[in-house]
From Swiss-Prot:
Its EC number is 2.4.1.17. Its main location: Golgi. It catalyses: glucuronate acceptor + UDP-alpha-D-glucuronate = acceptor beta-D-glucuronoside + UDP + H(+); a 1D-myo-inositol-1-phospho-N-[(R)-2-hydroxy-very-long-chain fatty acyl]-(R)-4-hydroxysphingoid base + UDP-alpha-D-glucuronate = an alpha-D-glucuronosyl-(1<->6)-1D-myo-inositol-1-phospho-N-[(R)-2-hydroxy-very-long-chain fatty acyl]-(R)-4-hydroxysphingoid base + UDP + H(+). It is a multi-pass membrane protein. It is found in: Golgi apparatus membrane. Belongs to the glycosyltransferase 8 family. Glycogenin subfamily. One of its GO terms (biological process) is inositol phosphoceramide metabolic process. It comes from the Eukaryota. This is Inositol phosphorylceramide glucuronosyltransferase 1. The lineage of its organism: Eukaryota, Viridiplantae, Streptophyta, Embryophyta, Tracheophyta. Its cofactor is Mn(2+). Expressed in seedlings, roots, leaves, stems and siliques.
């Protein structure tokens, strides 16, 4: 009998324990953090957001509402990162005229119908949590941050889901105006009295709250939705940055996962400090990377280097390739003697100087086409634009900032020198054709002189190329080296250096075109240059 009673007590205690555990588990699942993902482009942002939430010590559910545009691999990766993935259908934008990127943004309203949870904190994919925000679950029925012009921002919201509330929104979605053409404008119309709501104060005790009526909505302070756009205007936060809880990257196309944003927007450093700590939950995903981008980066980095080595090899293998180094050495010696003498040293001062650096005769100068300089400038800047466009198109967007910068420089320089080099070779060939048609004895003499050193390297072209490269690198790196963080100051310095670069390129392109045309006049009997794209030698 005693044993039976003991067994019954043990069974009763077990049932009570299970019930209590179930209750506690149910309580913990009544609230959640929620975000939306429309496509794979914002996947890295959601991953970093989740990591930032977990780094604050939160164990609440993290729910990612994903649309049909999200790949199965992305869903698998989010689950591996600890997100609960829920598939949803898009809500069409009812506005007749709206930006293309706002087509499905009304889908955000579906968070008001997440009735499995008592309360949810919604965070855009371009936000990060830098300090624990569990206090937001104390906020009333609807909470958001009031931005400039007395408009609420829907990037961070606290919502008490309700089917009745959601259905009411769906009935009014076609009748209420939206100043943005999206969900944010609709919510401002749906909650017209929001600017008059009181500010949420997480320090108020539960006892005090019980004595107050429950407000229909509350405003979140800037601490819970720190706008990077406003930061860039003043180059500082309007509040103590050590008290910030959420940073919101609102600068339109300048999203933190795009490598170039880090070179313009200082607060992106905080985002990348979280990104680099992302765990490898699936193979090749550590640090926010992916296997495809890693392979592309390696290919893009090695290909121009291999092409350069091949070009050098072909030059060395040439019958007169060694003269390139000799000419370069002679140029160094010339500069050394000039500095040492502290005066002007004529070209004849160094007897070993290549004849290609001697002044051209007036007869040869008269052969230069009238518009060659202007055409060369147009070709030069067209080559720059094409090089930049191709480089930004082929370099993956979501790689680390330094990696992206190095690859863009590498490919811009490579493509530019190839394009402009082909143009110089064309000008050189054009000079040859004109020289062949002319039977001027002065040109014959010039040709004979040049053929005695026909393989020597055109160091002047190399100097111009190095000058362009130096100014191009300085235009981006100098603000960083000087520690300038203000956006407009950075941009101003970059623009100033870019103007200097443009002036130098104008001068260099015009002089190089004339120089290579005159060399074509001299080289009309030499066929070695036209057979190689390695146009420096």
């Amino acid at each position: 009998m005693v044993r039976l009673k003991t067994s019954l007590w043990v069974l009763l205690l077990a049932l009570v324990s299970i019930q209590l555990n179930g209750s506690f588990g149910s309580e913990s699942s009544k609230v959640a953090y929620v975000t939306l993902l429309y496509g794979d482009e914002f996947l890295l942002g959601v991953r970093v957001l989740g990591k930032s939430i977990r780094d604050t010590g939160s164990t609440k559910d993290m729910v990612a509402l994903v649309s049909d545009g999200v790949s199965d691999y992305s869903k698998k990766l989010l689950k591996a990162d600890g997100w609960k993935v829920e598939k949803i259908s898009l809500l069409a934008n009812p506005n007749q005229v709206h930006p293309t990127r706002f087509w499905g943004v009304y889908t955000k309203l579906k968070i008001f119908n997440m009735t499995d949870y008592k309360k949810v904190v919604y965070l855009d994919a371009d936000t990060i949590v830098v300090k624990n925000i569990e206090d937001l679950f104390k906020c009333s029925k609807f909470c958001a941050n009031l931005k400039h012009s007395e408009r609420l921002n829907s990037g961070v919201m606290v919502v008490e889901p309700s089917e009745a509330l959601f259905n009411d929104m769906m009935r009014k979605v076609k009748t209420l105006s939206s100043y943005t053409g999206g969900d944010q404008g609709f919510l401002n119309s749906y909650y017209p009295d929001f600017p008059n709501a009181r500010v949420f104060d997480p320090s108020v005790t539960p006892e005090v709250l019980k004595t107050r009526p429950v407000p229909a909505m509350e405003r979140l302070s800037t601490l819970y939705n720190a706008d990077v756009g406003l930061y860039m205007l003043a180059n500082k936060w309007m509040v103590d940055d050590s008290k910030l809880h959420v940073i919101h990257y609102t600068l339109g196309p300048l999203k933190p996962w795009d490598w170039w944003t880090a070179w313009l927007v200082k607060p992106v450093d905080a985002w990348h400090s979280i990104r680099v700590k992302l765990e490898e939950t699936l193979p090749g995903t550590g640090g926010g990377s992916n296997q495809h981008d890693e392979l592309v980066v390696k290919f893009l980095f090695l290909l121009p280097l291999c092409a350069l080595l091949f070009c050098i090899y072909r030059s060395i293998q040439g019958r007169e390739g060694s003269l390139c180094w000799s000419s370069f050495s002679n140029q160094i010696r010339y500069l050394y003697y000039k500095v040492r003498s502290n005066g002007t040293l004529g070209y004849g001062g160094v007897s070993t100087m290549s004849p290609s650096y001697q002044p051209h005769s007036g007869n040869a100068q008269s052969k230069v086409p009238q518009h060659l300089g202007a055409v060369s400038v147009v070709v030069c800047f067209t080559a720059v634009l094409l090089s930049l466009g191709i480089s930004f198109a082929i370099v993956p967007r979501q790689i680390m900032p330094w990696t992206g910068l190095v690859l863009v420089y590498e490919w811009t320089f490579t493509i530019f020198f190839l394009l402009f080099g082909v143009f110089l070779l064309f000008v050189h060939q054009h000079g040859k054709r004109i020289a062949i048609q002319s039977e001027s004895s002065s040109l014959d003499d010039s040709a004979k002189v040049h053929q005695r050193a026909g393989g020597s390297c055109d160091v002047t072209t190399l100097y111009y190329g190095l000058g362009m490269a130096f100014l191009a690198i300085a235009a981006v790196s100098l603000p960083y080296i000087l520690g300038i963080t203000a956006l407009f100051t950075r941009l101003g310095l970059m623009v100033g250096l870019a103007i200097i670069l443009a002036a130098f390129m104008t001068y260099a392109s015009e002089h190089l075109a004339v120089r290579w045309f005159l060399k074509g006049l001299e080289d009309r009997r030499d066929t070695t240059r036209s057979n190689s794209l390695c146009f420096l030698c």
